[in-house]
C-alpha cells in the first residue's frame, strides 16, 4: 500500500518526469493526426498503448516542447544522466480529442491525480503574458531525451513602414528542435517559437510577431546564424520581420524552410546551407572592369617603366626669361659645347681675362660656356637673402669657323686647328649691373660629362630643370627595344653603364639611386604597380574602380531591402560600443631630452633617437689656413725659415713654406742703424729692392715707418725692430672629414606618460594609457641627412647637414658634392688664392673689427724682458675658398640632427575638463645664434616663464608656442639684431650672435635648361583639359557608380539610424 512505503522527493520527481514524457508523446501524436490522416498500418505492442489512449476529438496540439506541463525549469538544473536513460512509461494515456483547426487551443495541464484539465480559454494572445499562458511554462534549454545543443537567447527584429525607421528588438529562447509545423493552410506560425527572455515588446509588436506569414523575401546568414526576412500586413499596416531560424534539425538533416514566393537562393554548403550569392549583375560589373583594363593596356602600348621615377616638375611658360631668350625656348633641351679655363669675360666695355675676374678656385676645374644656337649665352646664380639671383646673357655671334675647345675633365691644351680658338664669352650687359663678386661658372661633376656650367647673375628667381622623361624605340638585336632619354634632370642621377644620361642617349636600361627604368614588357606589369597613378598605365583605372565596385556590390546586396539595416546591426554591429571621451586638453612639450609638462597627467620626453640607412660617401682633407711669424728687435740678414730658426718654429714654418699660394712679408719698423750699416729711409723703399741687393730674400720687404716700436723697449735712442709673417693654405696631416649619407630617416620620440612608456613616430603618433589617449603632433622626419665626421688633431666630432645636397644648384661647391677617396688623401676643391698679410699697430682702431676674407693681421706684443717682443696673428675668413674649409661645414650644419624647429604639441583626451592658461610674461635668457636673411634657420634658445604656454614672438614674427621651462627652436629671421622677444605681453632684449647675410651667400650653377617660377600661367582651360583628358575620362567613369553608391548609403543610413538604437 501507499501507506506502508513513504514517498520521497526522488520518487515524486521520477513520477513527474514519466508523466511529462507521456504528455509529450500524446501531444506529438495528436498534432500529427490533426494535420494529416495517417495511413493504416500494423503497429507493434510498444506503440499500441500510446495510440489507444489518444482522444481523436480533443483539441489540436502543436508539436514542440512548449506547454508540456513540466514543473521543473531544466535551464537551471538539468536532470542527471541516469534519469535521462530511463525507459518511457508504458502507462496508456487518454487520447486527446480533436478540435476544429481554426483556432489554436491552450494545452492541457497534467494533474496530480493522473487526470488532465484544460486551461481557461484566453483567445488569441495579445500580450506576452497571454502568450506565455497559452504555451505553458518556459521550455528547458536542453531536451531531456536528446543532447542537441541549444542557445540561451537569440534576437529577432520587427519594423513597420507606418512608423518609419523605428525598429523593435525581440529577445527570445530558441531550442534547436527543428522547424515548427505548418498550419493546414500552409502558413508558418512563429508563435510556437515566441518565448521572450528580454524586455517585453509592446502589445502590437507581439501581435505582429505572432501573425502567421508564409512569404520569405530573403535569407541572411553569417556563421552559425540564419535569419529569414518576411513582410506581411496586420490591420492594414505593412510589417517586416527578421526571424532567427535553426541551422540543422535533430536528425542531422538541414531544416526545411517555408516555401519562397518571391526569391529562392540555391547556394548551399556542407556547414552553412544558406548563404548570400552574387548573381549576374556582379559578374557583368567584373567583366566591364576587366575590359577597361584591357583597353587601357592596349592604349598604353610599349612604354618605358621606372620603378621609382623622380617627382615630376612641370615646366612653366618662359614669360620671365626676356625677349632675347624666348625664341630659344622651343629648341630646348639642347647640348652645349665645352669651354676652357682661359677664356675672357666682358666687364662693362672692356674684355678681361677670366683669371683677373673670376675667383682663383674657378680656374683649376674645368668649366665652359653653354652654346645655345648662334649666340654665346650663359646663366649665373648667386644665393643670398633667402633667394636666388639669375639672368640670361648673350653676346656677339661666334666666329664662322667653329673651334673645338678643351674638355671639362682635361684642362691641358687640346688639339686646335689653324684658326685661333674662340674665347669663351659670357657677356654681362647693362641689365646685370656688372659682375657680382663671388659668382662664376661651375666645375663638372663627371669626367665624361660634355656639358658645362653657365654664368649667371641678376634677376631674382629660382632655377629648375625639366622633368626626366623617357621613350621607347625598337632596334635590331636583343633585346629588340631600347630606352631613349627625352629630357634628363641631373639631380635624378640616371646613368647608363656608369655614364650620366643625356637627352638623346639610348640605353637598354637606366639606373639611378631611386631605381631602374626599362622598356621591357616582362617588367612592365611589376613596375606598373609603383606608377599606378600615371597617365600611361591603365592599372590606375583598376586601382580607382575596384574599391568602389566592391563597396557597390556589397551595399547593393545589403541595402536592397529595408531589412538590411536590421540585418547589419544584428549580424555585424551588435555589441559594438565605440569609445567616447569627455574633454580634450592641449599643451606643448619642448624637444630637449628631459623636458616635462602637465597635460593634465605628467608627460616627460625621455629621449630622442632616429633610424636610418647609411651609405659611405668617402673621406677628404679640408684646406687649412696656417700662419706664423716673428717679432725681432733687429733687422735679420737671412729672412727664411732657416735664418729665423731662433724665433720661428721650424715645423710649421716648413709646412707653410712648402704650401700653395704662399704669402711672405718682412717689415722694418723705424730702423735707423744696426750692425754698423747706415739704415736710411731709402734703404727700405717700397718693394725692398735696395735691401735685397745686400740681403737676398723671397719675401716682400716693406718699410713700416710710423708704427710703434715700443715692443723692443730698453734702447730709446737706438731702437730697431722687424716683423716677419708667413701664411699659406696647407693640407694639415691630422685634419680629415668623413662623409656619410643617411636615407629613410625616422625620428622616434620616447615619452613617459604618468609612468607609462611609449614611442611615437610620424607613422604612429598615439599613446594609449590608462589615463586616456595622448595624441602627439610630431614634426616631420628630417628626411635625408649628411653626416660630417670631423677628426681635428684627435678631437672627433660630428656635424649634420639637413636634406640631400643639390650638387647642381646652390650646394655645388659643398664638400659633400665632391669625389672623395677612402684614404682621406684628396683635398677638396681647387687651390685657393693667396692670403693677404697686414701689419697692424696695437692701438689701431682697425682691431675693433674682424679681418676680411683671406686677410691675416699681425700685431707686435711687448715682451716681459728688454728687447724681447712677441707677435699676435689674427686670420679672417678664407675668402672665395670658404666652402672648402672646416668653418664652412660649421656654418652650414648643425650638431643635433634630431632637433625640430618647434615644440611637440600634445592633445590629451580625458574624461574630465582641463584648461591650461596662457602666460604673458617675457621669456628670459633668450639667445639667438646663426644668421639672418641667409636661408638657414637661426637657433633661438631661452627659458619660458611658468603659468602656461608661451606664444613666442621675435621682432613681431610669431615662432609658435613653447611650453614652460627651457625651450630650443629654430626660425628664419628676416631682420638684423637687436631682437625683442615676448610671449604676447611685455618684451625683453635677447642676446644675439648672428652672421651678416653677405657672409652666408654662396654660388650655385645649373646645367642644361632652366625654367622660372612665375606668379601666373598662360594655360587656358581647353589646354588644361586636353592635357588631362585621361583623368577627366576616368573621373566621369567613376562618377556614375559613386553617385549610385552615395544614394544607396543614404538609404542605408536612414534605416540604420533606428536599427542601432532600437526600441
From Swiss-Prot:
Region (Functions as E2 signal peptide): 279-300
Glycosylation site positions: 353, 371, 410, 429, 658, 759, 791, 1011-1012
Keyword Ion transport: no
Segments of this protein annotated with the region Functions as E1 signal peptide: 563-582
Stretches for region Human C1QBP/SF2P32-binding: 30-69
Post-translational modification as stated in the protein's UniProt record: Structural polyprotein: Specific enzymatic cleavages in vivo yield mature proteins. Two signal peptidase-mediated cleavages within the polyprotein produce the structural proteins capsid, E2, and E1. The E2 signal peptide remains attached to the C-terminus of the capsid protein after cleavage by the signal peptidase. Another signal peptide at E2 C-terminus directs E1 to the ER, with a similar mechanism. Capsid is phosphorylated on Ser-46 by host. This phosphorylation negatively regulates capsid protein RNA-binding activity. Dephosphorylated by human PP1A.
Protein name, UniProt field: Structural polyprotein
